[in-house]
Amino acid sequence: MNIDPTTVNTHKVTTPDSRNNRLPILLIPFLLHKYGQATVPTMGGCNIGKRKVDFHLTAAEMFGATVETKESGYHAKSNGRLQGTHYTMPYPSVGATESCLFLSVLSEGTSVIRNAAIEPEIMELITMLRSMGAIIFLNPNREIIIEGVEKLTGTNMYVLG
């Protein structure tokens, strides 16, 4: 799989396939970093069923974005570069931990994510982000510390599974 973000030219995620999965919520951090705003449609379900996205939205706010929830979806906006923060998640959600990692790696300053998910896919994501230039430390007790960097580079990675 080749992922090329240089072809992205808008802060808006369109609806056609996005209501069938939960992926659009994970695009908010990237679009905030690139455009200073992100608009994503309301999430659809997945094999697990309908799940809330409030941890993702709260995380974006903790990093300095403002988030509006509308019937059609979510709009997040930042005034300049996102700022590192300390965020204790109410539950160790895999998706919300991914959002926090994506928000933090390009934010200014240090971020600490507490009560983070530690599933294998999170460890693989951290490995990938480190190979792209991210500075990430793991502490016991579900704590991840991230030093924000100015930019990330491309990478090659083999995915588990």
Please tell me what each predicted stretch does:
Residues 1-161:
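Structural preference for solvent-exposed beta-strand-turn elements
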